[in-house]
């Protein structure tokens, strides 16, 4: 993989089969390795993200290295800490064929540039509190732990994000 050939662009409807495969692979990996696992994923929410240009893919030549979504608000997870001054990264999944190739680092770098262009003060994300390995992984990329909380059961949250004990992480810009 040549990092200079890597691009981040919006996903399209044509990408849906691969997106669903990536989610299935991520869930399988989580379960096999004893990590907290998504209980499924909301295809309607993913379709809305695609339609609203909020889901992205990282590509290198013909290969899709991973997918992720963004938002500019996340009150269901961040509560009163959501002040409208952040870019939120969600559902970041690396294609298992490209693990170990610093795909997340490229996503983080893109997010920093994108958030700065939008004059936002933070990049934020969350992950399961009972996955200290993943928390440490994100800390290794410059994120700091802000808080821990339980997400709501609100219908505006994707199914896989409801009633979770999460650790909130942010990177000041």
Which residue ranges define each predicted feature?
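A short beta-loop-alpha structural element at the N-terminal edge
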Residues: 6-21
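C-terminal "cap" of GNAT-fold acetyltransferases
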Residues: 121, 128-131, 151-173
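Acetyl-CoA-dependent GNAT
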Residues: 13, 25-33, 37-97, 105-110, ...
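Glycine-rich phosphate-binding loop
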Residues: 102
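Conserved active-site alpha-helix within GNAT-family acetyltransferase domains
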Residues: 105, 117, 129-147, 155-157
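Conserved acyl-CoA
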Residues: 106-122
């Amino acid at each position: 993989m040549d990092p200079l050939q890597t691009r981040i662009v919006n996903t399209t409807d044509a990408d849906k089969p691969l997106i669903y495969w990536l989610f299935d692979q991520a869930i399988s990996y989580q379960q096999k390795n004893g990590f907290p696992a998504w209980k499924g994923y909301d295809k309607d929410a993913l379709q809305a993200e695609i339609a609203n240009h909020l889901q992205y893919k990282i590509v290198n030549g013909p290969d899709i290295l991973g997918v992720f979504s963004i938002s500019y608000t996340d009150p269901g997870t961040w509560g009163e800490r959501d002040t409208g001054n952040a870019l939120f990264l969600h559902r970041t999944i690396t294609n298992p064929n490209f693990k170990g190739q610093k795909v997340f680092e490229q996503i983080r770098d893109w997010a920093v540039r994108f958030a700065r262009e939008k004059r936002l003060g933070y990049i934020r994300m969350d992950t399961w509190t009972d996955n200290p390995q993943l928390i440490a992984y994100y800390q290794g990329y410059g994120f700091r732990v802000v808080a821990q909380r339980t997400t709501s059961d609100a219908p505006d949250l994707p199914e896989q994000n409801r009633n979770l004990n999460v650790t909130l992480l942010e990177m000041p810009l």
